[in-house]
C-alpha cells in the first residue's frame, strides 16, 4: 500500500474552530480529489443540504457573500491551481487553501498532507 494521505476541511469564526470533516486515503491524488469535491460542494451548496452527499462529505457552511464560494469554485476547477496543489503534495509539503467571508469573519481552510504511519514506541 502506498503511503497514506490525509485531508481535512476546517472552519474558524472568531475564536471558534471546528473540523467540518476529513479523510485518510491511500495516495495524494485521492486526497486532492476529495478536497476538490468538498470545495465544489461548499461553493455550490451555500449552506443548504446537498442531495448527492455521501457519508464522507463535509458539513455545509452558509456564506454571507459570494467571494468565498467563487474562490472555492475557482480553486477546484482551475488547472493551474490543481497542478500547483498536486506538486505541493508530491514535494511532501502540506497543502493549505483558505477562503474568507469578511462579512462574518469566517475562514474555511482545505488542507491535505502526507500522513506518516505511527512509529512504534
Question: Where do the language-model regions lie?
Answer:
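A broad, low-specificity signal marking well-ordered, structured residues that form hydrophobic/aromatic
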Residues: 5, 23, 108
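Residue-level detector of functional hotspots within protein domains
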Residues: 9-11, 25, 83
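A short, exposed loop/beta-hairpin motif centered on an aromatic-Gly-Thr core
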Residues: 16-33
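Short, well-ordered alpha-helical segments
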Residues: 35-38
Amino acid at each position: 500500500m502506498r503511503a497514506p494521505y490525509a485531508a481535512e476541511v476546517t472552519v474558524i469564526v472568531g475564536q471558534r474552530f471546528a473540523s467540518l470533516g476529513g479523510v485518510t486515503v491511500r495516495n495524494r491524488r485521492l486526497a486532492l480529489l476529495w478536497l476538490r469535491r468538498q470545495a465544489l460542494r461548499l461553493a455550490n451548496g451555500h449552506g443548504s443540504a446537498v442531495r448527492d452527499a455521501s457519508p464522507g462529505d463535509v458539513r455545509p457552511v452558509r456564506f454571507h457573500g459570494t467571494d468565498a464560494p467563487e474562490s472555492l469554485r475557482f480553486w477546484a476547477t482551475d488547472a493551474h491551481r490543481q497542478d500547483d496543489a498536486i506538486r505541493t503534495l508530491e514535494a511532501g509539503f502540506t497543502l493549505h487553501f483558505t477562503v474568507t467571508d469578511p462579512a462574518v469573519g469566517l475562514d474555511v481552510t482545505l488542507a491535505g498532507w502526507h500522513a506518516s504511519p505511527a512509529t512504534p514506541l
